[in-house]
Amino acid sequence: GLQVMTGFTLRPDRAALEIASRVYNGNATPRHFLWWANPAVKGGEGHQSVFPPDVTAVFDHGKRAVSAFPIATGTYYKVDYSAGVDISRYKNVPVPTSYMAEKSQYDFVGAWCHDEDGGLLHVANHHIAPGKKQWSWGHSEFGQAWDKSLTDNNGPYIELMT
């Protein structure tokens, strides 16, 4: 079957965790699979997702909904953003929402916390991992209940994936 080996490296004097994985198909025939590596990052009012500048549209898991990005101008996940809403900001996303970008010529996706003046970048070679994705439970009561259920004391979070 499918096998995965993963190594984690912490280097001195660097604020980075390097993760290297190898996937091996032990089946007799080729197999297709999806691979998402996703760090969870702090969400909340000050959170903003940082997608590469060539990501101008996103879609949901099943490609049922498509939106301009980062400024949504239509309906996405049954939310009316027709006034032009920055959906890269956590505070503007009330419902559980995923943003998937199929391709990018850049090697990163990130998060920035305006309240803390800091953030992170998730770096992956775009020739190997061309897609970018974000998942959020949203800031409504429903989303807050899931955040509380799935974290210890850290509150809202966003999943970033490449």
Put a short name on every predicted segment.
Residues 1-13:
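Low-complexity, acidic Ser/Thr/Pro/Gly-rich terminal tails and inter-domain linkers that flank the onset
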Residues 6-8, 17-25:
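Short, well-ordered beta-strand segments enriched in hydrophobic/aromatic residues
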Residues 15, 26-162:
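A contiguous, surface-exposed recognition patch within enzymatic or periplasmic domains that forms
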